[in-house]
């Protein structure tokens, strides 16, 4: 059964490593050393819930509801455009160090709310967990499926805690105005690129519904 565990671990790592809103938020909280381990835990637990829902039956609901899939896709496009705009606006600010200090004043609950938004409003999370992992895991018997799910969940926990701790360790270098400008510019452009790719998928979904 360990082979199924490592299959899930490798696939989960491959899907979670690319830069997205969730990774960007965890990284930024690590750089600020503000509730970064709590955020890593909440992201990992959210992934656990989504992965289990997708692998153990949730994928069928999404795949059988094309309008729901289209709604999730276009909602994600709007969210990613907004998130990317915020990152680029910060990158073009006149005083990034002042902006970073201002963000440090955010309360715990506001940070948690933002984390929930970047996780649960991100359509890629549902496409990855429900469509990709769900379709692969759904083909397995019950016991192998459990090991496969455990592997993908392990990848999430290892990645989010590793990212948060690494960002906190590198904080003195990454907290400078120059580094923050580069990071926010990269995050903003990547978010807009993902939004563009999702918009193309959304148009395809709508065309399929109308035909």
Swiss-Prot record:
Keywords: Amino-acid transport, Cell inner membrane, Cell membrane, Membrane, Transmembrane, Transmembrane helix, Transport. The keyword Manganese does not apply. It is found in: Cell inner membrane. The keyword Transmembrane helix applies. Its main location: membrane. GO terms for molecular function: L-arginine transmembrane transporter activity. It catalyses: L-arginine(in) = L-arginine(out). The chain crosses the membrane at residues 1-21, 37-57, 68-88, 111-131, 147-167, 186-206. It comes from the Bacteria. Pfam families: LysE (PF01810). Involved in the export of arginine. Important to control the intracellular level of arginine and the correct balance between arginine and lysine. HAMAP family: ArgO. NCBIfam families: 2a75, PRK09304.1. This is Arginine exporter protein ArgO. It comes from Enterobacter sp. (strain 638).
